[in-house]
Amino acid sequence: MKMRVVGTLLSSPFGKWGVAAILACAIASAVAAPNPVSGPKPSDGGYQTSAAHAILIEADSGSVLFEKSADDLIPPASLSKLMTAEVVFNEIKQGRIKPTDEYIVSTNAWRRGGAPSRTSSMFIPIHSKVAVDDLLHGVIIQSANDASIALAEGISGNESAFAELMTKRAREIGLAKSTFGNSNGLPDPRQLMTARELGKLARHIIETYPEYYKYYGEREFTWNKIRQYNRNPLLALTIGADGLKTGFTKEAGYGLVGSAVQNGLRLIVVVNGLKSEKERADEAKKLLEWGFHNFQSGLLFAA
């Protein structure tokens, strides 16, 4: 039997694992599954963040290290494209579509998500045929709304049906509260998620689709001679970040779901409701650094 846990780095005669190691070993003798360990909460004098909603998760065990209003339903903006991509990943995995399949960019996708929309876009010409894999790159790297709608229409016939599929799929992977009204995250009263479920979704993508998760770490993508850059500011920092997604609408504020690895410890951070791109990047970075500084993951028991 083996057990991996996350412990606070404490000073004690027993070394840096301190009391956490002793307790973990005791638990490991009776329990084989990882035991989530909660870190300090804002209400008890722990870490503070200006994000309205936040959570920090240790990816291997699912341990919650920090949370703030993590179960409030919020408009996720483009963070909901994580669910859009998950549905596409699953369709490929189930053999219902292939990355090389081509979908036509409809007038609707072009008008609502392309150049005329003045939103994040791949700038796909109307009625063009684009491979699923290219559309996925557009959604993941550029947050392209035209690509999101094209995928939705290609898979489900129309965006409303795809949004229903997103909600259904969310339930299948354990997201009990999330609901969707569109594929792109633009304002819709049905488009609601929580910070906790965004973190769960990120963890699911990382664990289930490693061959596609790597797309989230790509710094740029060129299609039709148009080069666009990844919107995730964490990728430019030296903190081990390799994903995932940013989001913004006036209603939602600035949000980010990110992940980084240091010394074998992967953390997932979610922040939302921030006032600027800079504050979003700063708060996500600080929370990750706090996690890496205060927690460590390791194999404590094997038999």
Can you say where each PLM-predicted feature lies in the sequence?
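A residue-level detector for conformationally permissive "hinge/kink" positions
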Residues: 7-16, 24, 54, 87, ...
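Domain-terminus/edge residues, biased toward the C-terminal soluble/receptor-binding domains
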Residues: 175-179, 187-303
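N-terminal secretory targeting signals
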Residues: 1-53, 96-98, 298-303
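Glycine-centered helix-coil hinge/cap
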Residues: 15, 157-158, 249
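Residue-level recognition of conserved structural "scaffold" positions that shape functional pockets
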Residues: 14, 22-28, 102, 134, ...
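Residues at the start of alpha-helices and the adjacent loop-to-helix junctions
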Residues: 18, 22-24, 46, 54, ...
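Active-site-adjacent loops and short helices of periplasmic peptidoglycan-processing enzymes
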Residues: 33-196, 203-207
